[in-house]
Amino acid sequence: MTVSENSVLETEVLVGGSAMPNERPGAMEPQKLSKMPEGFPRRSTVANGVRSRASRRFLVVGGALLLSLFAIYEMGAVFSIGGITPLEYLVLALFAVNFCWIALAFCSGIAGFLILLRKPRAKDLQVTELHTRTAILMPTYNESPDRVFSAVSVMAETLSQTGHGHAFDWFILSDTTDPDIALLEEQAFLVLRQETHKHSRVYYRRRRKNVARKAGNVADFCRRWGSRYDHLLVLDADSLMESSTITGLAQRMQADPDAGLIQTIPSLINGTTLMARLQQFAARIYGPVIGTGLGWWVQKEGNFWGHNAIIRTEAFMTAAGLPNLKGKPPFGGHIMSHDFVEAALIRRAGWSVVIAYDLPGSYEECPPSIIDLAVRDRRWCQGNLQHSRILPTKGLHWVSRLHLLTGIMAYLSSPFWLMLILTGLMLALQAHFIRPEYFTDQFSLFPTWPIMDSDRALRLFYITMGVLFGPKVFGVLLLLKDGEFARSVGGRIKAIFSVIFEVILSALIAPIMMFIHCGAVMSILMGRDSGWSPQRRDDGSMPWMTLIYRHRWHMLAGVMLGYAAILDSLTLLAWMSPALIGLWIAVPISAWTGSVKIGEVFKRAGILATPEERNPAQICLQAHEARAAYQKHIAEPWTLAQVLKDPALMELHLAMVDKQPLRAAGTPIEAMEAIVHVKVHEARCQQSALAVLNRQEMAMVLANPLMLRSLQKLPEQFVEEDLVSFC
């Protein structure tokens, strides 16, 4: 059968036409990191786009540098009165690294605070018609199909009502490896097509092999279909976006031909556990301060967070092809945290990368528990540390390098903070147990007393706490100033209670996360790869024994640090207690914060409430209703046995299988594919074949029409006369 005949057959089988449109192949070559590609950077074509002003960088980065130099000088002065020892030099160095990290966030927060005081409004571009085409991509990997497909259904329907639906196509790009979920996705896609085919173009493709994970998934789309579209709007499996935001992004791209990528700042929604609600509240109250400040000073040298952003296809395909790094994982191989690197490469090529901090209506969800956060952060930590090999890339803008460095420090800061705590503890124990040398080798009539400037040290402590908690304070001030905002979270009194509770609970969780990040860094330095595990989205609860096992080292570390502190004095133990209590009760904290029931208690009490929870956007309500409907639609899942038995079901399934050519005859065959071929061809019936195929092999069979046809030809069961089976 020819390709055209096959397409006609699919159109007849599937409501709304083929599962994917005709391919229009395009090149997306891996970029060279050691030298600038020819013709880069491109020249700007218009003067009405975003400009980068050095004055903003000077105010924020320069301010952070001056603040850091002052703090480092003060810390040096604390030690210098009696002469600085080697251990004190180490404390000074660790303090310098950690303070620079928080000073930049503080200065960005000041900028964001001042901007938000004026209540900026989203820019009205006055564009009435879109003449560009945008592909909206929803990558998914072993996610709940009811969540993914219902979200697309609602977004597609609301977008069609704006009159701009003709400018957008929707693509669900699956990398699912679980055969049961893969079949559920197909069922959900049939429902989605039935609902949307009259007003929207919605497509589905599941890759046979998920090479390079999410980045490879999007790159595969670009190479095969990307040339059909001017822009790519990339979502995540838990993303939602209002139609006004979708059209606003496309209009901004259309109005600024220099724009290569525009990133929104998503709001967190749908948190049911206490941990998820904590993240939602913190992101809603304090997040805009940092995000707005960051967007204000980075300007054309913004960043990409992997989703809820629109990308110019030309910029992405010509400038952001990711190379494989030399060596094996965790530092070699595919680039895991692809988003920062893609943004840096797009900017290197001369396109602008902008953070649209003024554009609302972008949503995502967050991990439901500390353990789920740890699993995600282990993967992110590996990807961000991998960026140490991207930093020397030729031609990157210094702000892009700073983004990469900031991502690295997001995880390296934990070991640095831990080392600072340990060296400070060692200084205290040294002063308590080791007799000081009052007379040095040099002749002196007076002894040398080991002293520090305690008043200056206390003042520096207050300054450090102010810098650390400054962005939180700015967020609270904005909340208290804005009466409408305060009412949207339950009023000022309840908001203050929520802030106090968030600060206390975050302080308890922080040392646990510090040790989790330290463990992740150590694991990576020891050469261990994170793999790619699907994320839990709703319930974060786990058995208590599992939690004890996962937090055993955290509790032990807390006990050991507490014992070391009490050897010096109860005063030192009291000073360290904010960092120790969370470690001592890590297991109950992890259990309680991951509980949906406890999260519901706090929701009813109105603690940690957000505007999106108390007054949800219409699209969020619609998505919730649609998900319940999809759960009913796919309540009776297909099985591979049913697909083989039912010819109509088989034709439906084959119409949704990726049409990428199979391995050509005579070319090398992978081990698993060879094993599956043997199992299929040796099987005497469908039942025996399914009995010997594991889940990974079943997923491969589902994506291979030839194997499916071979299995379909076999009898359902094998019966041999006069043969008696004994159990």
UniProtKB/Swiss-Prot annotation:
Would you name any one GO CC term? plasma membrane
**Top-level taxon of the source organism:** Bacteria
Please name the pathway: Glycan metabolism; osmoregulated periplasmic glucan (OPG) biosynthesis
Q: Please indicate if the UniProt record lists Glycosyltransferase as a keyword.
A: yes
Q: State the organism named in the record.
A: Shewanella baltica (strain OS155 / ATCC BAA-1091)
Q: Name one Pfam family in it.
A: Glyco_trans_2_3
- Coarse class of the primary localization is membrane
Q: Which HAMAP family match?
A: MdoH_OpgH
Region entry Disordered, spans = 18-41
- The transmembrane segments are 58-78, 97-117, 278-298, 408-428, 460-480, 496-516, 572-592
Q: Which UniProt keywords apply?
A: Cell inner membrane, Cell membrane, Glycosyltransferase, Membrane, Transferase, Transmembrane, Transmembrane helix
Q: What membrane topology does the UniProt entry give?
A: Multi-pass membrane protein
Q: Enumerate the PANTHER family for this protein.
A: CELLULOSE SYNTHASE CATALYTIC SUBUNIT A [UDP-FORMING], GLUCANS BIOSYNTHESIS GLUCOSYLTRANSFERASE H
Function comment: Involved in the biosynthesis of osmoregulated periplasmic glucans (OPGs).
Q: Where in the cell is it found?
A: Cell inner membrane
Q: Name one GO biological process term.
A: glucan biosynthetic process
Q: Is Endoplasmic reticulum among the key words of this record?
A: no
Instruction: Please state what the protein is called.
Output: Glucans biosynthesis glucosyltransferase H
Alphabetical list of InterPro entries matching this protein: Glucans_biosynth_gluTrFase_H (IPR023725), Glyco_trans_2-like (IPR001173), Glycosyltr_2/OpgH_subfam (IPR050321), Nucleotide-diphossugar_trans (IPR029044)
EC number annotated for this UniProt entry: 2.4.1.-
Family per similarity comment: Belongs to the glycosyltransferase 2 family. OpgH subfamily.
Encoding gene per record: opgH
**Which Gene Ontology molecular-function terms are recorded?**
hexosyltransferase activity
